[in-house]
Structures are given as C-alpha cells and as structure tokens.
C-alpha cells in the first residue's frame, strides 16, 4: 500500500549550553559531605551533609545533588601545598570581563594601574 506504520524514537541531549548552565547552578549549590561509617562495616554506608543551610541536623544527599568531599583550594592566594602561586602581581586586562580580566584575576582585592612610556630609535629613513 506504500505506507509505513513504523515509528522510531530516540533520546537526544539538550543543547550543550543548557547542560553547562545546569551544571553551574548545581556547582553553586553543592554541599560538603563526609562519609559516615557503620560500626560493623568498613566502607561508608552513606554520606551526610556537614552543613544544612537554614536548619540543623544531617540528611542523606539526593541522587541528583552535587556534593564534594573537601574544599577547593583558594587559587587567589599562594599555596605551595596545592601547587598554586596565586594571582598577586600578575598582569591583567582592565577592560576584559573574561578570565584574564582584572576583576576576576585579582579576586576582588583591587588592582593598581601603571602607565609606562617607552621611547626607542626606530632607524627610520625619510
């Protein structure tokens, strides 16, 4: 008869930018956890929240919640143990809102602007 009765469905990912925004939202609301060991077991039985915002007690993180086990190093400050030299004294781009810009690179500490004039002989011929 020339007609087709078969349908094919497949799953697709959302746009990459949407995934990035969702991960960033989860990153900013991530919770510090620590493993809780049962007395009879050697491995952790669950993770408990160390800090519950706005309330007391502990709770088990949900399967979709982003958690972390230790604080990230502060890359603004020098920390030899973490291998970070910090950002103090580094040149930055005052007009850039991106990673090399002064506002981000200087971690909100402010920055000094230096204007330098350099003269040299160009060996020009007229």
From Swiss-Prot:
Compartments (UniProt record): Secreted, Extracellular space, Extracellular matrix
Disulfide bonds: 92-107
Glycosylation sites: 93
InterPro entries associated with the record: Wnt, Wnt_C
PTM description: Palmitoleoylation is required for efficient binding to frizzled receptors. Depalmitoleoylation leads to Wnt signaling pathway inhibition.
O-palmitoleoyl serine lipid modification positions: 1
Entry GO CC: extracellular space
Source organism superkingdom: Eukaryota
Known function: Ligand for members of the frizzled family of seven transmembrane receptors. Probable developmental protein. May be a signaling molecule which affects the development of discrete regions of tissues. Is likely to signal over only few cell diameters.
Protein name per the record: Protein Wnt-7(II)
Originating species: Eptatretus stoutii
Lineage, uppermost ranks: Eukaryota, Metazoa, Chordata, Craniata, Vertebrata
